[in-house]
Every structure is written in structure tokens, then in C-alpha cells.
């Protein structure tokens, strides 16, 4: 039997009086591909933002490789092997390509220095 790589259990998130996610359960096994579909406002982006650490769930648990984790930031997600490609690229319009890349980089400073050296 394949072990779950990601488990969401009873994930809920509200913004004021608006319930964006209510008791969401999702299990993803290693080597599988899933899509999340729904109408506008159904809570898809909110759920993915919780998994990526941009939002914190009001309740529920998240497990990666059967270990319960707390995702307080995107860095926590990345450290647990979770990445996210945004539907709409979040670029700063008046920045250069290099500046946008460096802005989004969350790794060691060495990478940024090497990137700048390669660019110039």
C-alpha cells in the first residue's frame, strides 16, 4: 500500500463571516497527480495558500509523509517539500527579470550572488 505524501484533515478557513474552506479532507499519494476544480469563490486558491503557508488554517491538520506539520510561511512549506506555481505570476511590473527572480528567491544568499555575477 502506498503511503500518503500529503494529508489534509478537516481544514477550515474563514475571512470574517465568509467561510472559504469548511472541513476539507484531501489525501494525495506519492506518484499521483490531482486537480482541484470548482467555481470562482469555491475556496481552491485559499486551500492552496494554506498548503503553501501563505494563510494559516483556522482548524484542521496537515501531514507530510504521515508527520503532522505546522505551515506558518512559504519557507515552512518549501522545507517540507511543498512548492507552488501561482496562477497569476506575482511580478513587480517595473522590476527587471533579474530583480523579480532575486525578490522571489528564498534560498541562501550565495545563490543570489552567483545569479547576479552570471547576469553581469
Place the predicted regions along the sequence by residue.
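Glycine-rich phosphate-binding loops of nucleotide-dependent enzymes
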Residues: 1-120
Amino acid at each position: 500500500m502506498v503511503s500518503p505524501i500529503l494529508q489534509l484533515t478537516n481544514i477550515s478557513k474563514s475571512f470574517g463571516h465568509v467561510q472559504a474552506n469548511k472541513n476539507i479532507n484531501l489525501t494525495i499519494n506519492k506518484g499521483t497527480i490531482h486537480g482541484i476544480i470548482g467555481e470562482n469563490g469555491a475556496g481552491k486558491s485559499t486551500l492552496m495558500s494554506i498548503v503553501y503557508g501563505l494563510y494559516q488554517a483556522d482548524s484542521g491538520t496537515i501531514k507530510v509523509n504521515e508527520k503532522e506539520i505546522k505551515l506558518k510561511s512559504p519557507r515552512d512549506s518549501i522545507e517540507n517539500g511543498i512548492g507552488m506555481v501561482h496562477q497569476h505570476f506575482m511580478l513587480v511590473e517595473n522590476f527587471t527579470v533579474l530583480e523579480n527572480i532575486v525578490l522571489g528567491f528564498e534560498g541562501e544568499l550565495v545563490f543570489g550572488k552567483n545569479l547576479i555575477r552570471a547576469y553581469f
